[in-house]
Amino acid sequence: MSQTIKNAGRINQFREAVIRSLKGALPDVRDCGCQFGRFNLEELETQMLVAPAIRVAVLESRLNPVASGQMSADLHLGAFIITTGKERDVSSWLLAEAIAVLCHSGQLWGLTHLSAPREVQIEPIISAAIKQRGVSISVVEWHQDLHQLGHDIFCDEGQLKSGLISWDNEVGA
């Protein structure tokens, strides 16, 4: 991925920080990467994943304007867990619990301008046979607010700062 794409926005940086943290905390996971939207069975049939695998997705981002001209994003995130084999359900729950525990009240994923994770939940999605192998998919979902998206109009380089400051001799009578 080019440097331009990596620096394209805080939401992508946030997702990459979560992936880095999960890789560090769960070294037995063989494949950990990003996912666009929800993970489904059709994707599992077409993608070559080495289980156990985790795919991190931003499922929704609700943007709220802030007085500074910036935005704050209420992110709805999902870490999709893919496990295989006889013990796939047990493995799936173990990984889901580990990820959910990582979503503690002090978890900022190495970033700043971020709220604590909230509304953490685990949901089993499916356990089925695909291409003659048993596969389980579950998801850990949570919400987290990402602040200071965009430019602050009141910073030194801001466009409005000089327009908001007036001198006494500039005010007409």
Describe the predicted segments one by one.
Residues 39:
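Extracellular glycan-recognition surfaces and repeat-rich motifs
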Residues 1-36, 59-173:
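Charged, amphipathic alpha-helical segments and their flanking helix caps
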Residues 43-46:
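Short N-terminal edge-element motif at the start of the domain
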Residues 48-61:
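A short, hydrophobic beta-strand-centered structural micro-motif
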